[in-house]
Each structure stands twice: as structure tokens, then as C-alpha cells.
């Protein structure tokens, strides 16, 4: 950037940006290696990151190990499934840095544009359903329970990711958003479509780890 050609207001803003980027350079090998694993190359440290790095917190190592294990678990989730679940949580939490990261990683793992779009759509639908059905569950009134939902859910029919995985993503997001009725319903559906409790356990654990990662990075 040629600072001498910028208007005064823009000049001050650019100088502040440069100073901030230099000030917030993260001098922690473990943390930087985690960012590299996630293919995050342009990141401005959050206050939470700075707190951990400044104190040389042991949690940084825990976080890196947990994230690595979650995304590379091949016993019950393959790489593509794990990254797509992580993407769903990033979308749910509106954290663009990880949304872009997991989109790229998902494509590297073989996910198609249609599968990625479906995960985004599924996450949006779950945000709708989680609020609606949590309200019904809270109120426990016949009137609300018996009223037709009137919510279009065509993406649940013949999903490109398959019924089992679509329901699995729905379950994870419902767990993140705290909808008991939705969690119970989707857990039963995942099992009915041939999945196992072990896979469900790993999927929800993956979602919880990514939620924790976002708490630090955002």
C-alpha cells in the first residue's frame, strides 16, 4: 500500500491496521501449526487467543490435539464427513474464517458443491426447527403442539449427502443449539437409517470441539 497517496482518514486507518497486524503477530508454534492444519493463512488474533498465548496456556495444546483428532477420526467418521460436520457448526456459529477453511478442506476430501450447499441449507433449516420445536417443548400446550408447522422442508427428501448423514448433521446442529426434542428425534432417525451410536457419539463430539474452537478463535 502506498501510504502517501491515501486521504488522511484512510491513511490513519491503514496505519492502525498495520500496527495492529504487527502487534497481534502470534508467537506460539502450537497455535500456528493448528492454523496451518486448518489452512488458515489470514487471521487476526481474538482477545481469547491473545489471553491464551500471552499466558502460554496448556489449553492451546489440548485444543490443537482435540481439533486434529476430531477432523481425522477414521474409525466412525471419514474425513469428508468430519469436515462437513465441522463446516455445519462454523455456518451455525456464523464464523466465516472457519466456514471458508472447512469448505476448502471438504472439497479436498471429495465433497461436491452440492454436498457443501446442502450442509449449509441443513444448518439453516435446523436453526428454524430448533427454535420452533424448542418452543413447543417448553410450552407443552395442546394448541401449539397440534398446529401444523407449515415449514417447508423439501431438502430433507432425497438429500445428496444421503438420509443418514443429513440426519446426522441435523442431530449435531440440534445438539449445539440445545433443542432436546430435535436431538431425540434426529438420533432415532439416524439409527433407523443404519448408523450406530458410536458414530453419533463421534459426530456430536466433533461438533462440540469445533464449537469450542470457535469460542477461542472468534
Where are these regions (language model features)?
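Functionally engaged cysteine thiol sites
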Residues: 1, 109, 182
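Acidic, glycine/proline-rich low-complexity segments that act as flexible tails and inter-domain linkers
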Residues: 20-81, 92-160, 189-192, 208, ...
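Acidic/histidine-rich alpha-helical segments that form the ligand environment
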Residues: 149-181
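Preference for long, well-ordered alpha-helical segments
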Residues: 168-171, 175-218
Amino acid at each position: 500500500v502506498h501510504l502517501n497517496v491515501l486521504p488522511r482518514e484512510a491513511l490513519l486507518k491503514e496505519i492502525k491496521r498495520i500496527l495492529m497486524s504487527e502487534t497481534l503477530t502470534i508467537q506460539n508454534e502450537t497455535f500456528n501449526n493448528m492454523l496451518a492444519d486448518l489452512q488458515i493463512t489470514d487471521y487476526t488474533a481474538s482477545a481469547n487467543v491473545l489471553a491464551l498465548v500471552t499466558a502460554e496456556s496448556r489449553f492451546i495444546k489440548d485444543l490443537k490435539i482435540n481439533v486434529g483428532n476430531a477432523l481425522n477420526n477414521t474409525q466412525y467418521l471419514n474425513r469428508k464427513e468430519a469436515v462437513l460436520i465441522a463446516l455445519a457448526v462454523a455456518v451455525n456459529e456464523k464464523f466465516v474464517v472457519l466456514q471458508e477453511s472447512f469448505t476448502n478442506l471438504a472439497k479436498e476430501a471429495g465433497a461436491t458443491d452440492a454436498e457443501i450447499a446442502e450442509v449449509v441449507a441443513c444448518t439453516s433449516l435446523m436453526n428454524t426447527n430448533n427454535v420452533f420445536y424448542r418452543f413447543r417443548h417448553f410450552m407443552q400446550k395442546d394448541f401449539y403442539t397440534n398446529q401444523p408447522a407449515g415449514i417447508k422442508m423439501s431438502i430433507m427428501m432425497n438429500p445428496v449427502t444421503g438420509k443418514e448423514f443429513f440426519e446426522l448433521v441435523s442431530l449435531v446442529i440440534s445438539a449445539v443449539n440445545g433443542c432436546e426434542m430435535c436431538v431425540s428425534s434426529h438420533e432415532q432417525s439416524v439409527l433407523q437409517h443404519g448408523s450406530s451410536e458410536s458414530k453419533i457419539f463421534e459426530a456430536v463430539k466433533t461438533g462440540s470441539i469445533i464449537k469450542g474452537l470457535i469460542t477461542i478463535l472468534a
